[in-house]
Every structure is written in C-alpha cells, then in structure tokens.
C-alpha cells in the first residue's frame, strides 16, 4: 500500500472512531463505581485529565480482574469533550486494551507514546497497536500530540492507582 493510501486509511479510522466512539458513556454517573462489578471481583478506579493547551477533558474508568501485571482489563468506559483526535484516541484505546493484561497494555502504551513523540521518524507497529497506529501522522504536529495522548495518560494514571 502506498504511503498516501495508508494516510487516507489512517484518517478514515480516526474519523470513524470520532463519529462512533467505542466505550463512551453519555453521563458521567455511568462511570460511578459499579457495585455488580465490585461484587464480581473487579477493582475499579478512574482518572480525569485535562489538556490545558486546548481544553479537551476526559475521564477514564477501568475495571481490573486479577492482580499485578497479569490482571486483565475487563472494564473500560470513558466520558470526554474535545477534538476529534482526543475522542477518537479514547475510542481506539478502549478497543485496544479491553481484554488485555496490564503488562500487554503497558507495552501498547509505551509504543503509542514513543510513536507520537517521534515526529514521524518511527513507523508504527500495527501488529501491536492495531488501530492506534492510525495516529502516527499526528506525531508531525506537536500541538496535537497532547490531544492524542490525553486518554492514554488518563489510562496510565488509572493503572498506577490500581497497582
């Protein structure tokens, strides 16, 4: 596939996720600790993050089953307001980490962060990142990197709370 065709595909993935956000909840109250999930053994936490540059905001709630790096991400929900890039990134994050172990998700987080900080010098590992590789082009626009990273920063903060 040509570079131009790949960029168009990546742009379409971002637009699709921005229009139909996976894992998004309509009301923040839907992120409140779920008694049924706690009874089922899920440990939950949430993080609210703000991009002070543009005003994007997101709250991410994660539910883990198990313990340590082998714990699995069995619950993921988010609520946010912001640009298409930050909202699409949250949707892709939902699809990328749901059902994975904490260890796997941390690898994805590190690869995503490295890709975005590369300013276009690193080719995304599509096999590991899946649709998150679509944000590779964002790395060429430093002001937009914070938008794409916002949900991932919130996710990382939740994992730190739960560890």
For the regions a language model picked out, list residue spans one by one.
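Basic/polar, acidic-poor N-terminal "presequence/leader" segments
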Residues: 1-13, 60-62, 71-76, 81
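Short, surface-exposed loop/turn motifs that are enriched in glycine and acidic residues
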Residues: 4, 48, 79-83, 95-98
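Structured beta-strand/loop patches that form or line metal/cofactor-binding pockets in enzymes
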Residues: 20-77
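Short, thiol/selenol-centered motifs that function as redox-active sites or metal-ligating centers
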Residues: 54, 80-87
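Catalytic-loop motifs flanking and including active-site residues across diverse enzymes
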Residues: 85-89, 147-150
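Alpha-helical support elements that line or immediately flank enzyme active sites
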Residues: 89-101
